[in-house]
From Swiss-Prot:
Catalyzed reactions: beta-D-fructose 1,6-bisphosphate = D-glyceraldehyde 3-phosphate + dihydroxyacetone phosphate
Record gene name: ALDOA
Superkingdom, natural source: Eukaryota
Protein name stated in the entry: Fructose-bisphosphate aldolase A
Site positions (Necessary for preference for fructose 1,6-bisphosphate over fructose 1-phosphate): Y364
Classification of source organism: Eukaryota, Metazoa, Chordata, Craniata, Vertebrata
Cross-link Glycyl lysine isopeptide (Lys-Gly) (interchain with G-Cter in SUMO1) per UniProt, renumbered positions: K42
Other remarks on this protein: In vertebrates, three forms of this ubiquitous glycolytic enzyme are found, aldolase A in muscle, aldolase B in liver and aldolase C in brain.
Function: Catalyzes the reversible conversion of beta-D-fructose 1,6-bisphosphate (FBP) into two triose phosphate and plays a key role in glycolysis and gluconeogenesis. In addition, may also function as scaffolding protein.
Length: 364
């Protein structure tokens, strides 16, 4: 076995570990506001609003300037490249706004999925070229963590061994480059909820994918204490006719994680994967109440499940700003409780909060 050549100094390791711990402190989680220009277009279109740079800026500002009740709930905020360089009405750059509320700035660094030729519609993720230079610049511009999304699909013959291995290696290479630049990498191997598979099949695939990811991270000498994982919860496929309880989903999810994710990993920040806002909170709560030993923080990194009601309430109208922020605060508070296993659904969730946010073959 070759000798280990140290990739990071003790100081670098401490910085990475400290950032990761801040993001997943008890009761805290991440707002994923890193939709690409194409993805945010779909959100704005759903409320009849034009996809202009100013509308995108105003909407992100609405989320970032919500009142101080969100401060103990949302610490990490993942931004898209454009948003990192936008400013609030008062002239402050968005990273400054986030930091003034005690938050940590994150940046989406992947460049989207591309087809893996010779597979049944499977993909890998591009964006490694020039990543080191971009990370160095992002660090200077105030970002302390990053996100990279890979996508896998459950089908009769998918995910293939090739897709699993390729995506695991891409995530590991990305993680290595981030850590060299003082940025905490969030690895996101998303298994899409598309399909009619049951809970057991999703659990099996999730275990195989995560095992491959952590083997690759080990091969690439990643410092696990300075990383976070952003996985899907283990849920049945969207077209599965059998219904499963929140407790069954929690047990399957925690079991899969316990079998594959080393305890050295600081935290697990779940994606919401098209669940309704309310469902995402209830399942997160059930996961935290699951009666198995859980060595990592288990919290949220939600996009649609923090924003859907707020987006509807805003409706593209400036005069609805406060109403929209109120909806966002509600979801932030709900998820802050859920990641501590303390959330009790009131049964009064608005229509928007109970609405499925599933999008077939979701591109980000």
């Amino acid at each position: 076995m070759p000798y280990q050549y140290p990739a990071l100094t003790p100081e670098q390791k401490k910085e990475l570990s400290d950032i990761a711990h801040r993001i997943v402190a008890p009761g805290k989680g991440i707002l994923a506001a890193d939709e690409s220009t194409g993805s945010i277009a779909k959100r704005l279109q759903s409320i009849g609003t034009e996809n202009t740079e100013e509308n995108r800026r105003f909407y992100r500002q609405l989320l970032l300037t919500a009142d101080d009740r969100v401060n103990p709930c949302i610490v990490g905020v993942i931004l898209f490249h454009e948003t990192l360089y936008q400013k609030a009405d008062d002239g402050r750059p968005f990273p400054q706004v986030i930091k003034s509320k005690g938050g940590v700035v994150g940046i989406k660094v992947d460049k989207g999925v591309v087809p893996l030729a010779g597979t049944n519609g499977e993909t890998t993720t591009q964006g490694l070229d020039g990543l080191s230079e971009r990370c160095a610049q992002y660090k200077k511009d105030g970002a302390d963590f990053a996100k990279w999304r890979c996508v896998l699909k459950i089908g009769e013959h998918t995910p293939s061994a090739l897709a699993i291995m390729e995506n695991a290696n891409v995530l590991a290479r990305y993680a290595s480059i981030c850590q060299q630049n003082g940025i905490v990498p969030i690895a996101e191997p998303e298994i899409l909820p598309d399909g009619d598979h049951d809970l057991k099949r999703c659990q099996y695939v999730t275990e195989k994918v995560l095992a491959a990811v952590y083997k690759a991270l080990s091969d690439h000498h990643i410092y696990l204490e300075g990383t976070l994982l952003k996985p899907n919860m283990v849920t049945p496929g969207h077209a599965c006719t059998q219904k499963f309880s929140h407790e069954e989903i929690a047990m399957a999810t925690v079991t899969a994680l316990r079998r594959t994710v080393p305890p050295a990993v600081t935290g697990i920040t779940f994606l919401s994967g098209g669940q309704s806002e309310e469902e995402a909170s209830i399942n997160l709560n059930a996961i935290n109440k699951c009666p198995l030993l859980k060595p990592w923080a288990l919290t949220f990194s939600y996009g649609r499940a923090l924003q859907a009601s707020a987006l509807k309430a805003w409706g593209g109208k400036k005069e609805n700003l406060k109403a929209a922020q109120e909806e966002y605060v509600k979801r932030a508070l709900a998820n802050s409780l859920a990641c501590q296993g303390k959330y009790t659904p009131s049964g009064q969730a608005g229509a928007a909060a109970s609405e499925s946010l599933f999008v077939s073959n979701h591109a980000y």
